[in-house]
Amino acid sequence: MNLLLISRDFCYTDTCLIKSPGRIGISAWRGNVQGEIMLGIIYLLLAGMLGCEASKMLTGEGRSVSGINRIWLMLPASLGVGTLLLTWMVYIISWFFSVVGKAENPLLYGNIIGMTGAAVIMILLSVQKYRKQGSYRIWNIDKTQDKRRLKKEILLFGLLTVFITYMMFYVFYIKDGILYSGLTVYGDYAPHTAMMRSFSAGNNFPTQYPHYGGADVKYHFMFQFLTGNLEYLGMRIDFAYNIVSTLSLVGFLMLLYQLALRITGKMCCGVLALFLFFFRSGMAFFRFVWEHIQAGNLVETLEENTSFIGYTVNENWGLWNFNVYLNQRHLAFGLLMATLALYLFMDWLEAGTAHEEKGILWIKNRIFSKEGWKSRNLDQALLMGMFLGLCAFWNGAAVIGGLLILCGFAIFSDGKVDYAVMAGVSIFFSWLQSKIFIVGSAMSPQIYLGFLAEDKTVPGVVKYLFWMSGVFFLGLVLMVWFMRRRERAILVSFLFPVIFAFVLLMTPDINVNHKYIMISYAFLTIFWAWAVCSLWKGRNGQSGIQKTMGKILAIV
């Protein structure tokens, strides 16, 4: 099948650039291996089943939290862990057969051995469980503690999956043999689709950039390898890319919901946090509307506008919109694994913040007491560190962002040894992958104050944050003083990636730091959702006028 990737201004073929008004595309080609789409589905099912067994070692089989339906924890954990394990297994085996065995079709061996190995492992585990228990169940306890809430959650995640699937296919789909790519994403999709096809229709081992980017590969590419492998197994490229993208983003949002439910104890906060995830705060729209009301052309401008609204540097790129998750599909998978780590290490944080000491004495004991350092679950820390480290070439920014938040958790937690072990193992696996895939240094960290703010002073940064996010970040800084110790520790930790973005530069392009701000934004929506729900509901003893004012503030 000959495909053409269509978007806006140019049309690329394999060998030349052809001017084509209104379109830009990359010709795509299929290899000789034509599998059945069922093989790709079997691959994903095997990954999920393998991940289900492996993730039990992380989440604790037989453990339950009252009132929380842990199925929404286990499903994304199974997807993330299983996909990591099986995909790395297939990649390593394929690499060996290509580089050492000089095989022309290394993915054939990688998939046969990897998928067969996963199936054998599942069969052996099933037999072992049957002999031990007399029956086989995927989970040993009921993962649906609250049946009434479960029905609402099924509806919530069903609608969420439909919406995300629609958005994924809206910007990337095949029609009449032509592969279409959306206007706001085609720039990134060009190298991404090339990387996918370098595996599905080529032999890109050792892996390098398809577009003559050098002998090594400094960019995280494993998500593209997964998509390319699914296409190799017979899935159409748009189905492969969109299915794994949808599963990753829905899985991340399931964990974000679970995290919100655990922090606040309210389902409404979890639902509203997901809503706020898609609709960010900001002052750009209000400024835009006011300017065009004054000019008298607001309606016409809104009808004709095709660009992102923004007044801060590069905001018109869509740096702060949901478009980021459509453009950078691999970010959601990395955040899925990072959020899993945060959810698990909440146990450590809650233990640390539950002590009765107050003020300086409490902080002192978190640093100098035995409980502050004594390991609570070393095995879990080792495993989570390994899985997080294996994500480095899926999405490095998500790994760094997750470690930054966990660093904040560690300050206020008991069991700091476990944090150190987890971070050390994660950094080791990241370093190991960098040594294998990268010639030279992957990053060159340096102090760079102010991010994209034109005025790099503290007042200038505050002004930038206000125009970029409205009261979102600045309001939380004030809100933290009215919280209890546990919530205050969580909120401060969620701010660590934002602080990092305004202080350090990891790559030559400072714009890349926007991902760390987006990571913080995703988690901090929990606290704004909590504030809005609390204002809307009001407190016992409030007058009708006070409750009405609270509802008005919640809407605003």
Label the model's feature ranges.
Residues 8, 12, 29-147:
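Membrane-embedded, hydrophobic transmembrane alpha-helices
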Residues 422-431, 534-556:
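Signature aromatic-anchored transmembrane alpha helix within multi-pass, membrane-resident enzymes
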Residues 147-151, 160-337, 356-357:
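Active-site lumenal/periplasmic loops and adjacent helix-entry segments of GT-C-fold
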Residues 137, 145-151, 351-379, 413-421, ...:
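Membrane-interface helix-loop-helix junctions at transmembrane boundaries of multi-pass membrane enzymes
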Residues 322-327, 366-373, 380-395, 407:
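Membrane-interface alpha helices of multi-pass inner-membrane proteins
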Residues 246-249, 331, 400-403, 510-537:
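Hydrophobic/aromatic-rich transmembrane helices and adjacent perimembrane loops
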Residues 187-195, 201, 412-486:
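Transmembrane-lumen/periplasm boundary regions of multi-pass, lipid-linked membrane glycan transferases
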Residues 340-351, 401-411, 425, 467-488, ...:
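Hydrophobic, aromatic-rich transmembrane alpha-helices
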